[in-house]
Amino acid sequence: MKKPNHSGSGQIRIIGGQWRGRKLPVPDSPGLRPTTDRVRETLFNWLAPVIVDAQCLDCFAGSGALGLEALSRYAAGATLIEMDRAVSQQLIKNLATLKAGNARVVNSNAMSFLAQKGTPHNIVFVDPPFRRGLLEETINLLEDNGWLADEALIYVESEVENGLPTVPANWSLHREKVAGQVAYRLYQREAQGESDAD
């Protein structure tokens, strides 16, 4: 029988914090592309100074790899948006397994949810399905509808071939790396008006 092409199929592993080493099931869903352990390790090293007590928003939660990792590292809370019903149900089960009472799963299309007036978050994860043109629309909805706190950090994962995404003028590129065909970047937001105060 042919083995899967990638190891760890069907589960994610939390790599740091209070739930370090815990493995959690992930449904087999087309297009589900959990952020790799290596990329997550780099990202959460970047976020280490600010993750504790942060309010986090995971716009395309999928496996929950980013939101659950943030909670494991003592984020104050997390909202995980996931459109696929089966995937969102598994996220709810995984949160219950971890006894994570400081998180909620929103079973919704991210664009529809983010089009509403939001509450400010300190850290936002934007890791949309590739090749669907969702990235820049998501970025604009976050900025325009109040989802971002002053000085929020926004993690963006995208295809290398697309180059730098267009971001609001008050976002600055803080960190950037490439892993294979995936570019991952961390942006820092300034409150509107601060960048004009020089």
Curated annotation (Swiss-Prot):
InterPro entries: DNA_methylase_N6_adenine_CS, RNA_MeTrfase_RsmD, SAM-dependent_MTases_sf. Pfam families: Cons_hypoth95. This is Ribosomal RNA small subunit methyltransferase D. Specifically methylates the guanine in position 966 of 16S rRNA in the assembled 30S particle. One of its GO terms (biological process) is rRNA base methylation. GO terms for molecular function: 16S rRNA (guanine(966)-N(2))-methyltransferase activity; nucleic acid binding. PROSITE patterns: N6_MTASE. Keywords: Methyltransferase, rRNA processing, S-adenosyl-L-methionine, Transferase. Its EC number is 2.1.1.171. Belongs to the methyltransferase superfamily. RsmD family. It catalyses: guanosine(966) in 16S rRNA + S-adenosyl-L-methionine = N(2)-methylguanosine(966) in 16S rRNA + S-adenosyl-L-homocysteine + H(+).
